[in-house]
């Protein structure tokens, strides 16, 4: 919600013309979501604001997605948007606990990030541990119906899942960056 309509339109054109990736926030907290609805009454859903400006496609990375409901998750999956889960930040600024297991089960592309602006750690080891703890909290919130992330899954989200967005092969093979 910090960009004008003109800037959003420019960024959409620039990303399209140059094939650039786009990173932003989506459904991080309820106050932000209400603010976006006020700023864009023509868009029924938060994600539609990005789509309106050409910023909603397979080159899009959306951080947080804590409060993304089934419809928003479907829209992300269909567009090929990558979710970047930032558990340390989400916990630190009281955003909530993202339904990462549900996102993975629904076929969304999910990677792990630090969002150092709101989090405490740049270390992906620390953020992996935060993601696993957050998934355990989410499991309790979901009445024990979802499983929590395992260590291998957490490490995959911290490494190969993010690399896949940039077209790199998964794993720690020679030549991977």
Model-inferred region functions:
Residues 28, 87-91, 116-118:
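Short, acidic/turn-prone active-site loops that include or flank metal/cofactor-
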Residues 1-82, 94-110, 170:
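Histidine/acidic residue-rich metal-binding segments in metalloenzymes
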Residues 52-59, 101-177:
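His/Asp/Glu-enriched, well-ordered alpha-helical/loop segment
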Residues 32, 89-90, 145, 168:
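Glycine-rich, flexible loop/turn motifs
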